[in-house]
Amino acid sequence: MSNQHSSTAAPSSYILDSANQPTSFDGNEQGDVNPKPLDHIRPVCNLETQMSNLPTDSVYASQPDGGLVAWLQVLGAWVLFFNTWGAMNSFGVFQTYYESGVLFDRSSSDIAWIGSIQTFCLQAMGLVAGPLYDRGGFKILIVTGSVGVVSGYMMLSLCEEFWQVLLAQGFLIGIAEGCLFTPMISILPTYFSTKIGLATGIASSGSSMGGVVYPIVMKSLMYNIGFAWTTRVLGFISLGMLLIPIIVMRERVKPALRVHRDLIDLSVFTDWPFIVFVIATMI
């Protein structure tokens, strides 16, 4: 009888200390069981504490790899690609208009700085947006970036000088797009595993679609309603579309389960394979 009860599991709210043996029980002939004091049993530690100590890979091990919520993230990312890289791909229309001298008189090389700074800000913002995302700033980045893009277009509609356009389109819109870029490429791997290639491909096609739609809209409106109202229309289009990711996109992996890093992490510059990769990408 005692042997039969010796294998009885401890209550679910306790686990055995690895330094001790399982509890044994003494029973009499009538089948009464008198357990020994459970001195060597300790309470289960908090689940969140246990999970936070797990390797990062284990947190991503249970991606749903599909489902309505997962594909809504793809839709949201598609919209973000449309309004970031898609808008960036249409800068040639802006440059052609600026070179016409209607708004200001500057050389082509000077005008090219607007698009170059916009592209630089979009990618350089990853230095700050990445750690903010890891600290749970997903929604903050999405909302801030969306407001910045819309505000940038509205400010651009008021510009009459080169330096004003440089600030509104190059810096403001560029930084705002950088706030959107990091979340949209970071969220999909938390929802997909085997279908991550398909999901990323669908989402990134938004940049190509934006590069087709934006130039058509701009060419149709620029010489009919003027530069100011054309950029305002772009702002209204962005406002309507960017409400979609704000509403449907959500974090699946909680910030407490992520690996935190400094806001500006300079340790990456000690990773020589990564540095070589970055240099090769630049070339």
Curated annotation (Swiss-Prot):
InterPro entries: MFS (IPR011701), MFS_dom (IPR020846), MFS_trans_sf (IPR036259), Proton-linked_MCT (IPR050327). SUPFAM superfamilies: MFS general substrate transporter. It is a multi-pass membrane protein. It is found in: Membrane. Disulfide bonds: none annotated. Its main location: membrane. One of its GO terms (cellular component) is membrane. The chain crosses the membrane at residues 68-88, 111-131, 136-156, 165-185, 196-216, 227-247, 263-283. The keyword Transmembrane applies. It comes from the Eukaryota. Eupenifeldin is a bistropolone-humulene meroterpenoid first discovered as an antitumor and anti-leukemia agent. This metabolite also shows anthelmintic activity against the parasitic worm Hemonchus contortus, anti-malarial activity as well as antifungal activity. Pfam families: MFS_1. Keywords: Membrane, Transmembrane, Transmembrane helix, Transport. Disruption phenotype: Does not abolish the production of eupenifeldin. One of its GO terms (molecular function) is transmembrane transporter activity. MFS-type transporter; part of the gene cluster that mediates the biosynthesis of eupenifeldin, a bistropolone meroterpenoid that acts as an antitumor agent. Belongs to the major facilitator superfamily. Monocarboxylate porter (TC 2.A.1.13) family. This is MFS-type transporter eupM. It comes from Phoma sp. The gene is eupM.
